[in-house]
């Protein structure tokens, strides 16, 4: 089986992957380096934004980082930790569903809407 490392510059994990209009879109979680202690509250995870990656050829082509598409600061009820998201298309709109902790540290599910798969 052929393998390839796609994004060496950042801490990204848990991707959802979709093909929209013949292009592969990757929606990973994005963690930031920190020195927080590992505990049951997940304080060691600083996941404060999402990036979208895409490519025409996952094994040989260039992987484009479309940059930050959603940030904790963009979400009024956000507390911390944007976990693994997923995206669905309906009627030409792209819906990103994401779990995160609110200001009371309770997990909630939110949705963001865009006109393009890259945000």
Annotate each language-model stretch with its function.
Residues 1-119:
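Carbohydrate-active catalytic/glycan-binding domains of CAZyme proteins
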């Amino acid at each position: 089986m052929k393998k390839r490392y796609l994004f060496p510059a950042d801490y990204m994990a848990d991707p959802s992957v979709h093909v929209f209009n013949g292009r592969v879109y990757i929606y990973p979680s994005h963690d930031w380096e920190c020195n927080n202690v590992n505990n049951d509250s997940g304080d060691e995870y600083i996941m404060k934004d999402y990036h979208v990656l895409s490519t025409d050829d996952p094994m040989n082509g260039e992987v484009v980082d479309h940059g930050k598409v959603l940030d904790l600061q963009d979400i009024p009820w956000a507390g911390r930790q944007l976990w693994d998201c997923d995206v669905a298309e309906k009627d030409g709109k792209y819906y990103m569903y994401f779990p995160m902790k609110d200001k009371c540290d309770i997990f909630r599910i939110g949705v963001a809407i865009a006109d393009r798969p890259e945000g």
